[in-house]
């Protein structure tokens, strides 16, 4: 079936590149766009705790962007992966409840359900015997040292003492690329922290003569605490979560690291990667902005207290969508259960 989208190829290419910090490779992305066919992209997540604002909004905005550009999106709910990675102490029932919570957050934020499929890893793997065969073939292709270098995808270090199940994890994630759809995934749309396993999938495809996936890796926002720290669920004060109250949002933003420099500045990152993309137009410190270049130019002269107030107000406007969504009687218990889960340290 041919893509019926009327936007020209150059515009579609620009739109797809706008969501990525890194593209592997541009030539193959151009070929895909020029083909005019409907393509398939995927993103996946471990249901491993509270969902922070970057994971929620970037997933929704990138998914909708891909669909607008003529693609279809698979959101892969990696429940078995979370169990293997010892999230929620391996309690699969809690993990699955968290997965349902994530899906509801995406819905509240306006994900395009017409072009999105949610696939649960446990159900998919159990019903597709070829998945295990593919995973074992990738394991045969790889070395232990190569797989351990991919441990960043699990939030682990290469030097960590890993369980045997965690060694399988990168091979399984690479297998997703070739098994989720019969013809293979066209675009891996994951965070830049997942690039090593994407490269493993690309190298494997090259070696086995398979369709080579395109990797469109998005930026990972830094912690509100400042440079050298990635936004993390393990640092509640370093991130805004989609179940935070208005007061919690305001307090976190007011305490956030923010200098006159835009480099390594979490407030500027929130504006650039979340708020401007979401709203299109921002009123910051009494001035209207429609592009990041103008904000960057004026940033050093902005009153940071006033700026933080504006940023917190915009964030609360977005999270209000989620707050209202979970007021539905059938969802209030789900939210209560999620809030009660405490992620143990591993």
From Swiss-Prot:
It comes from the Viruses. A motif ('HIGH' region) lies at residues 47-56. Keywords: Aminoacyl-tRNA synthetase, ATP-binding, Ligase, Nucleotide-binding, Protein biosynthesis. A motif ('KMSKS' region) lies at residues 230-234. It catalyses: tRNA(Tyr) + L-tyrosine + ATP = L-tyrosyl-tRNA(Tyr) + AMP + diphosphate + H(+). Its EC number is 6.1.1.1. It is an enzyme of class 6 (ligase). ATP binds at residue 233. GO terms for molecular function: ATP binding; identical protein binding; L-tyrosine binding; protein homodimerization activity; tyrosine-tRNA ligase activity. InterPro entries: aa-tRNA-synth_Ic, Rossmann-like_a/b/a_fold, Tyr-tRNA-ligase_arc/euk-type, Tyr-tRNA_synthase. Homodimer. Catalyzes the attachment of tyrosine to tRNA(Tyr) in a two-step reaction: tyrosine is first activated by ATP to form Tyr-AMP and then transferred to the acceptor end of tRNA(Tyr). NCBIfam families: PRK08560.1. This is Tyrosine--tRNA ligase. It comes from Acanthamoeba polyphaga mimivirus (APMV). The lineage of its organism: Viruses, Varidnaviria, Bamfordvirae, Nucleocytoviricota, Megaviricetes.
């Amino acid at each position: 079936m041919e893509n019926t989208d009327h936007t020209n190829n150059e515009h579609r290419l620009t739109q797809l590149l706008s969501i990525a910090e890194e593209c592997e490779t541009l030539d193959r992305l151009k070929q895909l766009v020029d083909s005019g066919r409907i393509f398939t992209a995927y993103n996946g997540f471990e249901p491993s705790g509270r969902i922070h604002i970057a994971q929620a909004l970037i997933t929704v905005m990138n998914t909708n962007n891909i669909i607008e550009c003529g693609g279809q999106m698979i959101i892969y709910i990696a429940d078995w992966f979370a169990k293997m990675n010892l999230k929620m102490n391996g309690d699969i029932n809690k993990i699955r409840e968290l997965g349902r919570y994530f899906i509801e957050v995406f819905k509240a934020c306006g994900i395009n359900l017409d072009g999105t499929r949610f696939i649960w890893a446990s159900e998919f793997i159990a019903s597709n015997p070829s998945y295990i065969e593919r995973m074992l073939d990738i394991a045969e292709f790889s070395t232990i040292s190569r797989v351990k270098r991919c441990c960043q995808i699990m939030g682990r270090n290469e030097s960590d003492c890993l369980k045997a199940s965690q060694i399988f994890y990168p091979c399984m994630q690479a297998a997703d690329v070739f098994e989720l759809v019969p013809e293979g995934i066209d675009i891996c749309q994951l965070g830049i922290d997942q690039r090593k396993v994407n490269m493993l999938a690309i190298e494997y495809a090259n070696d086995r003569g398979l369709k080579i996936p395109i990797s469109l890796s998005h930026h990972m926002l830094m912690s509100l605490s400042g440079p050298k720290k990635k936004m993390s669920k393990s640092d509640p004060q370093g991130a805004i979560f989609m179940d935070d109250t208005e007061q919690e949002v305001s307090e976190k933003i007011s305490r956030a690291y923010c200098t006159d420099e835009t480099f390594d500045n979490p407030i500027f990152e929130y504006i650039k990667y979340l708020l401007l993309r979401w709203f299109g137009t921002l009123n910051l410190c009494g001035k209207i902005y429609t592009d990041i270049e103008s904000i960057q130019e004026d940033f050093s002269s902005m009153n940071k207290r006033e700026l933080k107030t504006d940023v917190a107000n915009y964030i609360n406007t977005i999270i209000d969508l989620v707050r209202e969504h979970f007021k539905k009687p059938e969802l209030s218990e789900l939210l209560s259960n999620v809030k009660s889960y405490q992620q143990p340290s591993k």
